[in-house]
Amino acid sequence: MSMQDPIADMLTRIRNGQAANHVSVKMPSAKLKVAIAKLLQDEGFITGYAVADEAKPELEITLKYFQGKPVVETIQRVSRPGLRIYKGKDELPKVMGGLGIAIVSTSQGLMTDRAARQNGTGGEVICYVA
């Protein structure tokens, strides 16, 4: 059976891994998942990620903790296959008053809500991370 929403699966694996205090989580790799992992690393929500080149590429995300607590408090899918959510540059949400990020898929690639506002572009809101 095929996976209906691979991005939601990725976010759930991260959420469950941190709830169980795992060091890392593994999942099937895809270009969009790697781009999301890169954004999460750049913003300091995860320690790192690696893509294993095998017959079926696998993405391993190393989770980050601070004083024994997960750095990611909430990670929530917004736009999904059954209901796409698009926002213009002026409508992009500020997650937790600017403490969190919204990952946005724009015509210029995947970026945070702050970067999208600076570039003056809107797009599909993939998820919220705080």
Curated annotation (Swiss-Prot):
Keyword Translocase: no
A Gene Ontology cellular-component term: ribonucleoprotein complex
GO BP field: translation
InterPro entries (alphabetical): Ribosomal_uS8 (IPR000630), Ribosomal_uS8_CS (IPR047863), Ribosomal_uS8_sf (IPR035987)
SUPFAM superfamilies found in the cross-reference section: Ribosomal protein S8
Tree of life domain: Bacteria
Keyword rRNA-binding tagged: yes
Record key words, sorted: Ribonucleoprotein, Ribosomal protein, RNA-binding, rRNA-binding
GO molecular function: rRNA binding; structural constituent of ribosome
Cross-referenced Pfam families: Ribosomal_S8
Known function: One of the primary rRNA binding proteins, it binds directly to 16S rRNA central domain where it helps coordinate assembly of the platform of the 30S subunit.
Family assignment from sequence similarity: Belongs to the universal ribosomal protein uS8 family.
Subunit organization: Part of the 30S ribosomal subunit. Contacts proteins S5 and S12.
Protein name according to UniProt: Small ribosomal subunit protein uS8
